[in-house]
Amino acid sequence: MKTLLLTLVVVTIVCLDLGYTMTCCNQQSSQPKTTKTCAESSCYKKTWRDHRGTITERGCGCPSVKPGIQLECCKTNECNN
């Protein structure tokens, strides 16, 4: 009976994917710090300049960017602040 219960617990954990999640900053430019819990294993910070000045975008994952956009990807909680 104990073996069956242990097996059910392990199967539940594997099926629900109760693994590690990241906490990434997601505020834009100079806005107050906000965070988001992400399923991805990394966070990013994109920076570029336009007529408004320097723009910063933060979020989950590590996206592809166009030339002229600086991208920093990292793998620890809130590392993209």
From Swiss-Prot:
Q: Where is the signal peptide?
A: 1-21
Report the SS bond pairs. Answer: C24-C43, C38-C60, C62-C73, C74-C79
Which GO-annotated molecular functions does the record name? acetylcholine receptor inhibitor activity; ion channel regulator activity; toxin activity
The record's subcellular locations are:
Secreted
Gene3D superfamilies hit by this protein: CD59
Q: Which GO terms describe its cellular component?
A: extracellular region
Alphabetically list the UniProt keywords.
Acetylcholine receptor inhibiting toxin, Disulfide bond, Ion channel impairing toxin, Neurotoxin, Postsynaptic neurotoxin, Secreted, Signal, Toxin
Q: What does the tissue specificity note say?
A: Expressed by the venom gland.
Task: Please explain the role this protein plays, according to its UniProt record.
Answer: Binds to muscle nicotinic acetylcholine receptor (nAChR) and inhibit acetylcholine from binding to the receptor, thereby impairing neuromuscular transmission.
Recorded family membership: Belongs to the three-finger toxin family. Short-chain subfamily. Type I alpha-neurotoxin sub-subfamily.
**Protein name as annotated:** Short neurotoxin 1
